[in-house]
């Protein structure tokens, strides 16, 4: 298993949680961004800087992630693309995206985009807070425990 992080706008608190999880579970975590990122010295954590451009980091993640991996992103179209490949995905607020939920989330996202394009002020997401941090940590821990159970049973892909 590899954990891929859409890191351009990822909160520092989430990166800290991922660093601790990488150490605890000895799972590689790759932060992908179009800017230089500093990561703690660890054999389990690395950063990949991609060229600037629309969805370049997303394209790198889609090309790299395979079933059995986990993608961390707030980008619904990216989540939809990796879920379509059989890769597990979750937001940094702890929302798990799967084949049963991603279609609805994508439809909602597209509707909000249309409203914004039409001039409707719908606001943005709330600031990342303590409840979000806790929800992410809990969702990540649950995913890692599922992975550990399947690893003991042969590490079947897509089991996160």
Curated annotation (Swiss-Prot):
HAMAP family: UPF0178. This is UPF0178 protein BPP1051. Belongs to the UPF0178 family. It comes from the Bacteria. It comes from Bordetella parapertussis (strain 12822 / ATCC BAA-587 / NCTC 13253). Pfam families: DUF188.
């Amino acid at each position: 298993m590899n954990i891929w992080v859409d890191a351009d706008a990822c909160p520092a608190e989430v990166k800290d949680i991922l660093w601790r999880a990488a150490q605890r579970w000895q799972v590689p975590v790759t932060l992908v961004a179009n800017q230089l990122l500093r990561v703690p010295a660890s054999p389990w954590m690395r950063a990949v800087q991609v060229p600037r451009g629309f969805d370049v980091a997303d394209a790198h993640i889609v090309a790299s992630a395979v079933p059995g991996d986990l993608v961390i992103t707030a980008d619904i179209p990216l989540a939809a693309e990796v879920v379509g490949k059989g890769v597990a995905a979750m937001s940094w607020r702890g929302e798990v995206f799967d084949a049963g939920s991603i279609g609805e989330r994508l439809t909602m996202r597209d509707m909000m985009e249309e409203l914004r394009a039409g001039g409707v002020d719908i606001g943005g997401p709330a600031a990342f807070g303590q409840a979000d941090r806790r929800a992410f940590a809990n969702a990540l821990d649950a995913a890692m425990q599922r992975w550990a159970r399947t690893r003991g049973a042969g590490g079947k892909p897509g089991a996160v």
